[in-house]
Amino acid sequence: MEFRLATIEDVNTLCELEHATFKNPWTLEHFSYELKENEFSKTLVACHNGLLIGYINYWIIYDQATINKVCIKEEFRRRGFAQKLFDLAFQEIKKEECMICTLEVRVSNHNAINFYLKNGFEKVVKKSAYYSDGEDAYYMVKGVY
């Protein structure tokens, strides 16, 4: 297993993985923006035998972190890759002295919700029709100390 910061050379693979995983995926342009222009954005990738198999994207804006995406290629799920990416991201989030970390997750994504609860997040509120397809989201928060 190898973990590293994403580079612009990863953008096509990130986009392919995104489109295979999410109902409303980020576009190639959005990934390019996150990697090249958004000064608050960080993307860590997980590689297995040289193959990019997952990533986490998060923002650190002053004393708040936001987890935007956690994605692992389907055949590599439940092997600890997401947890390792999460742990590495939180090392950076703590180092940057963030007070809280937030995220939104589809109410139907039970695996992700359980993962976030296991990692200390709490459901704060349900956001009605948060996603473009009308699905609700949970807004979840974790204190970072």
Predicted regions and their residues:
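Acetyl-CoA-dependent GNAT
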Residues: 5-75, 86-88, 92, 96, ...
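Basic, alpha-helical helix-turn-helix
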Residues: 18, 27, 102, 128-129
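Conserved catalytic core of the tyrosine transesterase superfamily
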Residues: 41, 100-106, 136-143
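Positions that flank functional sites
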Residues: 33, 108, 131
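Extreme N-terminal starter segment of soluble prokaryotic enzymes
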Residues: 1-3
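Conserved catalytic-core motifs of GNAT/GCN5-like acyltransferases
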Residues: 104, 117, 122-138
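Conserved glycine-rich acetyl-CoA-binding loop
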Residues: 51, 70-87, 94-96, 100, ...
